[in-house]
Amino acid sequence: MLAWVIIVSIITAGLSVALVGMNATKAQGNAAASALESVARQPEAGDQINRMLLFALAFIETIMIFTLTVALILLFANPLLGKL
């Protein structure tokens, strides 16, 4: 049973970081592309668009950091191993 918990934890950590990483990268690319398009349409609003883009990128990156934190907890301080 202990081996299965370790194997599933490793697979879960790897898949979660990979999937969230791919989606976060795609979301950041879409946000940057939309911001560039918005600045091209309204150059006078560039400062406000840039500020909002930075907030959006920070929120997207926060999701990735939380996922990485959970994956590292699963790998190195797995709470499921103490219950077995």
Swiss-Prot record:
Annotated site, Reversibly protonated during proton transport, chain positions: E61
TM region positions: 1-21, 53-73
Subcellular location: Cell inner membrane
Entry keyword Transport: yes
Annotated GO MF terms: lipid binding; proton-transporting ATP synthase activity, rotational mechanism
SUPFAM superfamilies, per the entry: F1F0 ATP synthase subunit C
Keyword Nucleus: no
Protein's membrane topology: Multi-pass membrane protein
Gene Ontology cellular-component terms listed: plasma membrane; proton-transporting ATP synthase complex; proton-transporting two-sector ATPase complex, proton-transporting domain
Keywords: ATP synthesis, Cell inner membrane, Cell membrane, CF(0), Hydrogen ion transport, Ion transport, Lipid-binding, Membrane, Transmembrane, Transmembrane helix, Transport
Pfam families: ATP-synt_C
Secretion signal, residue range per the UniProt entry: none
Main location: membrane
InterPro entries linked to this entry: ATP_synth_F0_csu, ATP_synth_F0_csu_DDCD_BS, ATPase_proteolipid_c-like_dom, F/V-ATP_Csub_sf
Subunit structure: F-type ATPases have 2 components, F(1) - the catalytic core - and F(0) - the membrane proton channel. F(1) has five subunits: alpha(3), beta(3), gamma(1), delta(1), epsilon(1). F(0) has three main subunits: a(1), b(2) and c(10-14). The alpha and beta chains form an alternating ring which encloses part of the gamma chain. F(1) is attached to F(0) by a central stalk formed by the gamma and epsilon chains, while a peripheral stalk is formed by the delta and b chains.
Physiological role: F(1)F(0) ATP synthase produces ATP from ADP in the presence of a proton or sodium gradient. F-type ATPases consist of two structural domains, F(1) containing the extramembraneous catalytic core and F(0) containing the membrane proton channel, linked together by a central stalk and a peripheral stalk. During catalysis, ATP synthesis in the catalytic domain of F(1) is coupled via a rotary mechanism of the central stalk subunits to proton translocation.
Homology family: Belongs to the ATPase C chain family.
Protein name in UniProt: ATP synthase subunit c
Species lineage: Bacteria, Pseudomonadati, Dictyoglomota, Dictyoglomia, Dictyoglomales
